[in-house]
Amino acid sequence: MTLTTPLSITAIVPAAGVGSRMKADRPKQYLLLNGKTVLEHTIEQLLAFPLVNKVVVAITDGDPYFPELTLAHDSRVIRVSGGKERADSVLSGLSYVQEHQLSEWVMVHDAARPCIRHSDIDKLIAEVIPEHIGGILASPVRDTMKHATQEQCIETTIDRSVLWHALTPQLFTTELLFSALQTGLEQNLSITDESSAIELMGYQPKLVQGRADNLKITQPEDLDLAEFYLQKMKKETK
C-alpha cells in the first residue's frame, strides 16, 4: 500500500475554536475528561484507526495549551495554523496534505467529538470510498421538529423523516474538498461543514448512519455525558 492509495487516509482536526458556550477558562478541546483533554481523546481515537496515516491539527497561532500535550510531540501529529472560521482551518490542513502528498482521501473530524468509534469509521469508509465523491456520518432526527417564527413561536411542524443530524468524520477526496472549500471561501458562501461546501459544487455526498452517542461537546452538561460514553467504550474494549 502506497501513501497515495485510497487505503491511506489523513485525518484533519480543526481545533482553533474557542467554545464560548462552555463558559470555561479555556477552549473546550482542552477541558479534561478522565484525566486527558478532550482533544487528546479525539486524536488518540483517530491515530488508533489502522488506515489513518497522520492527523493534521489546525491550531490557533499562539495557542498555549497544545504544546503542553504529549501528543504534540508525536511524529504522526502535524500542527498547522488554524483560521478564523472552520473552513479556513480545514483548508489550511488540506493545503498541508496536498503539499506533502499524504493521501488521496481526507477525513475531517471535530475536535470536540472524542467518542467516535472505529466501527463507525469502518462503516463510513466502506460505504463512501466506492462512490468516489465522499460522505458523512449522520444520525436520523428522532424528535419532532418545529419551524419557528422570529418571535420564537411555532410556525409549522417539519417532516422529520427527511432530516438528519450531520456528524463527523466527513470523508472526501483531498482534491475535491480543497477545491470546494477554496471556491466557497473565495465566493463568500456560507460553509457550515465540509459537506456543505461539496453540496455547493452540485454534488450529493452520501449519508452514512452513525451512532447517536458520537456527540459534540458544546454545552457544560455534555462533559458528563462524554465521560460516561468514554468509560463505556473503554470497558467494551477490555
From Swiss-Prot:
Transmembrane as UniProt keyword: no
Biological processes annotated in GO: isopentenyl diphosphate biosynthetic process, methylerythritol 4-phosphate pathway
Job of this protein: Catalyzes the formation of 4-diphosphocytidyl-2-C-methyl-D-erythritol from CTP and 2-C-methyl-D-erythritol 4-phosphate (MEP).
EC number, UniProt record: 2.7.7.60
Superkingdom per UniProt: Bacteria
Keywords: Isoprene biosynthesis, Nucleotidyltransferase, Transferase
Positions bearing the site annotation: Positions MEP for the nucleophilic attack: 160, 216
Phylogenetic placement of the source organism: Bacteria, Pseudomonadati, Pseudomonadota, Gammaproteobacteria, Vibrionales
Biological or metabolic pathway of the protein: Isoprenoid biosynthesis; isopentenyl diphosphate biosynthesis via DXP pathway; isopentenyl diphosphate from 1-deoxy-D-xylulose 5-phosphate: step 2/6
The organism of origin for this protein: Aliivibrio fischeri (strain ATCC 700601 / ES114)
Segments forming a coiled coil: none
Positions of the record's site feature: Transition state stabilizer: 21, 28
Substrates-to-products reaction catalysed: 2-C-methyl-D-erythritol 4-phosphate + CTP + H(+) = 4-CDP-2-C-methyl-D-erythritol + diphosphate
Record bears the keyword Transferase: yes
InterPro entries per record: IspD, IspD/TarI, IspD/TarI_cytidylyltransf_bact, ISPD_synthase_CS, Nucleotide-diphossugar_trans
GO MF term list: 2-C-methyl-D-erythritol 4-phosphate cytidylyltransferase activity
Family: Belongs to the IspD/TarI cytidylyltransferase family. IspD subfamily.
Name the record gives this protein: 2-C-methyl-D-erythritol 4-phosphate cytidylyltransferase
